[in-house]
């Protein structure tokens, strides 16, 4: 049996920062990091996001392998906890911005189209805790 795809069909892959990059050079924890650091037993063989698949350090080789496999697009996430320096002011971390710039430049050079998302297991844990406080207080006042 032969399956024919349209000429404009895009072969792609997907990953997320927390599942691929590891926690290298990040100033903040996201909810995935926090879960691992507080309950490592919840993770298979206690393996968590600290190293992940090491995409942070191996992205050039990993992207070259994707190109070699015929991948034309990659859905990838930008971790807020890597990109944002100060969560209250929203200032950008230059190290994080440079990392993503290098990743996207490499993808462009290889002819791999990036599809970027901004949320995939990566809500900063600080914001999670703030939202729980803001949600919980009115709930307590209402006796719910």
Task: Tell where the protein language model's regions lie, with residue ranges.
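Short low-complexity, flexible loop/linker segments enriched in glycine and/or proline
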Residues: 89-91, 129-132
């Amino acid at each position: 049996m032969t399956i024919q795809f349209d000429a404009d069909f895009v072969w792609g892959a997907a990953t997320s920062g927390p599942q691929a990059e590891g926690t290298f050079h990040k100033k903040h924890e996201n909810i995935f990091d926090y879960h691992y650091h507080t309950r490592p037993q919840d993770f298979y063989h206690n393996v968590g996001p600290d190293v992940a698949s090491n995409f942070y350090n191996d992205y050039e080789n990993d992207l070259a392998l994707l190109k070699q496999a015929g991948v034309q697009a990659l859905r990838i996430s930008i971790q807020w906890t890597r990109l944002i320096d100060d969560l209250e002011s929203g200032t950008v971390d230059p190290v994080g911005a440079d990392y993503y710039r290098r990743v996207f430049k490499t993808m462009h050079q290889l002819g791999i189209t990036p599809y970027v998302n901004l949320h995939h297991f990566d809500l900063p844990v600080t914001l999670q805790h703030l939202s729980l406080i803001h949600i919980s207080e009115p709930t307590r006042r209402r006796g719910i």
